[in-house]
Amino acid sequence: MGKPEIRFKGYTDEWEQRKLEECLSEITYGFTNPMSDTEEGPWKITAKDILDGMINYSSARHTSQIEYDDLTNKSKPLVGDLLLTKDGTLGRTAIVDAENVCINQSVALLRFNEKCSVQYAKTLLDTPMYQKQMLDDAGGGTIKHIYITKVDKMFISVPCMKEQERLVLFFNNLDNLITLHQRKCDEVKSLKKYMLQKMFPQNEQKVPEIRFEGFTEAWEQRKLGELVGIYDG
């Protein structure tokens, strides 16, 4: 990819092709030994806790501060690091947005240098092309694995930092729009469910609780067979 087909006005330079490792100061994965669950303490993030582009703290568990302190830095991502699920559920990404977080071996940590913003890298790795490449390169039998030794050798397309920022802003705005419309859709679905309960008689009642103006007669109770013909296929 030298240049994208659609581009913001004012940008004409070729995009650079770089191995992902050229844009990283660190790529690793988390702890392998079991760690205890606690009621409070540092967050313990596994692949199942990365969903819809974010860390899902409602499913994540805590671990003890003592065990967290004993971990090496490779298991303790910093705010702004990119997480990538590498075992089981593959290719999901999230940017670390809290301190005192640790990851297990099902999650890779990618720390980007000045050549590539983490937000741009996340947007890029979420595209169908790079998702497919990571899945195609995955190994294993029943449970698939993404190998970080293959991930960091992937070639990625890197524009200048200002264009990276424009792209990130554009797709963030689209995500916000999707979220807004999804919320409205959920509200309409809830309204429909509510009205289905209120606009049909319940528990052998003769009239529904909510009704269109001008209709007052009781509803008739009939067997379905009186109204339709039922045939076996």
Regions of interest found by a model, annotated:
Residues 1-12, 183-217:
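Short amphipathic coiled-coil heptad-repeat segments
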Residues 21-25, 34-67, 102, 225-228:
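DNA target-recognition patches
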Residues 2, 86, 101-108, 139-163:
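A short glycine-rich beta-alpha junction/loop motif
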Residues 46-48, 57-130:
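A short beta-sheet element
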Residues 9-29, 211-233:
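Non-catalytic DNA-recognition/assembly elements of restriction-modification systems
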Residues 163-177, 181-183, 220-222, 226:
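Extracellular/lumenal glycan-associated surfaces
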Residues 73, 118-159, 200:
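Secondary-structure capping and domain/repeat boundary segments
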Residues 9-14, 109-118, 149-168:
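Proline-centric
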